Amino acid sequence: MKKILLLLAAIVMLCVVVSCSDDDEPKRGDGVFTVNTPMINHMYNTVTGEVLGLSNTHNKLTIDTAKHTASLELVYNNGSEQKLILKDVTAKPKRLGFYELSSPSNAQFRGYVDFNESSMRYYYTTESGLRVISTNAEVFFLKTHNVISYNDTTTSTDMSNVMYEFTFTPGMDNAIVKVMGITHAKDVKYFNSITAMNVPYTITANGYILSGQNIPTTARYISTIDTTMQTVKTTTDYPFKTFDVTVDLENDYLDAVYMMGSSATVVATGSTYPDYASY
């Protein structure tokens, strides 16, 4: 699916360059695409206060990138499979390949599609009061602010643009966490990625809380002082000694505090898209 969305992103960009047609019956080449995307439904009953388990779903999006319109078939399960069909969706371009979605007939709906990052997210509330947030299996935060304090308590580092990715699977109690692009100044290492395969999490009304201790990780890094061509090295020396993270889907917010082994503590905040934090 990610390859399909990346291909669509390239086609979307090409359509912008050649100025796609605005005919009443546009062809696929005119910028009309249909994508049936596997997604994860996060559900919360606003009437009873019950937080429901995650479920797999497929949501169908048809978007006309020339006319900035779309239609959606959103599938959710509340005892039985049900659908919310929106035929009057406005697809407002915010930047190349990124569209903010809204519906004049359904004020409870909002969302976005980002062909650049192969990402979609839909928010809606059903007539029965079920709040549904549909996300890709991977929930990521592209822009963050990070303060890294070292164990001698005398130094710290401020970093932006560290990326966080969380993968949730229905029926599983553990998530996959990946931290990308973080520098450990004291150990002179730049980490391409630090990956933890089994991070315990709970589902909340707004998203997820991830928490654990001594969580094994696999880290890929290069030296920050070696200016020669380097081969990426792998280490398991930076487990998450402590890990406490709030992923707030409803408000698109990340709040994280974790330890890289015993040598550094990271405090991170951020959002998926800082320019469009409120969809």
Pin down the residues of each PLM region.
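Bacterial Sec-dependent N-terminal signal peptides
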Residues: 4-6, 14-40, 129-140, 256-279
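Tryptophan-anchored aromatic micro-motifs
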Residues: 26-55, 136-161
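Hydrophobic lipid-interacting interfaces of membrane-associated proteins
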Residues: 38-43, 75-79, 127, 146-149, ...
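N-terminal glycine/threonine-rich, aromatic-flanked beta-hairpin/loop signature
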Residues: 50-85, 158-195
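Extended lipid/amphipathic-ligand handling interfaces
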Residues: 58-64, 88-92, 111-115, 162-169, ...
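Contiguous, well-ordered beta-strand patches that form the walls/edges
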Residues: 71-115, 185-239
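Short, exposed beta-strand-loop hairpins at the edges of beta-sheets
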Residues: 118-130, 246-263
